[in-house]
Amino acid sequence: MKRCCEGVGLPCLFKGVGMASSRPPKYLLVFDFDGTIINESSDDSIVRAAPGQALPEHIRQSFREGFYNEYMQRVLAYMGDQGVKMGDFKAVYENIPLSPGMPDLFQFLSKNHELFEIILISDANMFGIECKLRAAGFYSLFRKIFSNPSSFDKRGYFTLGPYHSHKCLDCPANTCKRKILTEYLAERAQEEVEFERVFYVGDGANDFCPSVTLTSADVAFPRKGYPMHQMTQEMEKKQPGTFQATVVPWESATEVARYLQELLKKKC
């Protein structure tokens, strides 16, 4: 199946994971992080490292809809002022629980890695994602990770930046996952890698935006009862047939693994 879309050259973390086979993978598998790979929002989780495991009212009241990245910059600055260091953040990230069944799904993908190219698109941050994936032992599964840049400055403060700018009216100002996904597919097409199918595993409203671009050959895996699932249901009710991808809701990621396993059996 040939895919064509405009825009290339999106900056990202390239991990250079080698495939066992010289043939390119058949399928692209896209993961979200917060509420998908992990069972929490990592931005909420890190508050456990703050004094009293809580934020002051003036920080919490500073949140503006659509500008969550800016809000988190203020949260991290406050935590830096309170003496929270890299090791404190790292410990929290490493101990965030994975979503139900996620280890099973990752084990399945590890055994079938030559068939799947796996990327992660998240509105969290690079440091937190790397900490958790390394601790869980699944970091090497991902070819590329797209997320907000983060680092520790000379003071030891945890700093966060926006991923990019975009013109999408449906997404937060710092990240549009649809833009990231379409540019990634275009980049891979220029490298003569065309995927038979795209699978998207997510939970949030910002995962709905890229899933709308999926074709009838693709599969969207929204977490059952979460915003992405609710929005696909609403679109199907109001505009039947507009959402083209097959929708497979999940409560446990084991269900995603079973679906993919059945797909591979049919292909054999």
UniProtKB/Swiss-Prot annotation:
InterPro entries noted in UniProt: HAD-like_sf, HAD_hydro_PyrdxlP_Pase-like, HAD_sf, Pase_PHOSPHO-typ
EC id: 3.1.3.75
Primary site of residence: other
Induction of its expression: Up-regulated 5-fold during chondrocyte terminal differentiation.
One of the GO BP terms on file: bone mineralization
Keywords: Hydrolase, Magnesium, Metal-binding, Mineral balance
Binding, Mg(2+): 32, 34, 203
Tissue: Expressed at sites of mineralization in bone and cartilage. Highly expressed in hypertrophic chondrocytes compared to non-chondrogenic tissues. Expressed in chondrocytes but not in heart, liver, lung, kidney, spleen, muscle, adipose tissues not duodenum. In diaphyseal cortical bone, it is expressed in the osteoid layer of the periosteum, forming surfaces of growing osteons, and newly formed osteocytes, whereas it is not expressed in the endosteum and closed osteons. In growth plate cartilage, it is limited to the early hypertrophic chondrocytes and the ossification groove of Ranvier.
Active site feature: 32 (nucleophile), 34 (proton donor)
GO molecular function, one term: phosphatase activity
Cofactor(s) named in the record: Mg(2+)
Domain of life, source organism: Eukaryota
Subcellular location: Extracellular vesicle
Binding site for substrate: 43, 123
Cellular component, GO, one term: extracellular matrix
Reactions that this protein is recorded to catalyse: phosphoethanolamine + H2O = ethanolamine + phosphate; phosphocholine + H2O = choline + phosphate
NCBIfam families, per database record: DKMTPPase-SF, HAD-SF-IB
Similarity comment text for this entry: Belongs to the HAD-like hydrolase superfamily. PHOSPHO family.
Described function: Phosphatase that has a high activity toward phosphoethanolamine (PEA) and phosphocholine (PCho). Involved in the generation of inorganic phosphate for bone mineralization.
Protein name (database record): Phosphoethanolamine/phosphocholine phosphatase
